[in-house]
């Protein structure tokens, strides 16, 4: 099948057909195909846009540089959040290949994005990376004054299963000056983290 047919499949209501198109593109991409997918990051058709995001993830590391550029430089909030989600998909689709330093630093910088849709998407992407970036998540949690971002960071730290997060979450729980919802989230997250970290040690 042609690339054009695969792109048409990305619009299909059936997720199995979309997946076929996604992997068809990922197996036959070039720079022009990546540019075409990048142009869909603000597509109004959410099914098509999400399929483009997943396809950029399926392509993998060849899409990281343009995704980071879009994440940090686009004026369009939808493009920035889609770029963060696509970087998460790179990690999900290629678990045996660490995200490049460029990708990690791009996500770290995007934690400071003023738009919550973008900074929370970046936190979620870093949560997918897990233990290799837990120190960056901890650093962001210790310095942010944004409660919504802090809640996302707490959950991402817990999801990594890295024991380094336990003391950080305990400090928030013990800090009576901290936002009450952030403390509440840390309380529920720490038990999850202790359980997962305990399994990893055994």
From Swiss-Prot:
Keywords: Antenna complex, Phycobilisome
GO MF, any single term: oxidoreductase activity
Induction description: Present in both red- and green-light-grown cells.
Pfam families, A to Z: HEAT_2 (PF13646)
GO cellular component: phycobilisome
Signal peptide region: none
Superkingdom classification of source: Bacteria
Protein name: Uncharacterized phycocyanin operon protein Z
Taxonomic source organism: Pseudanabaena tenuis (strain PCC 7409)
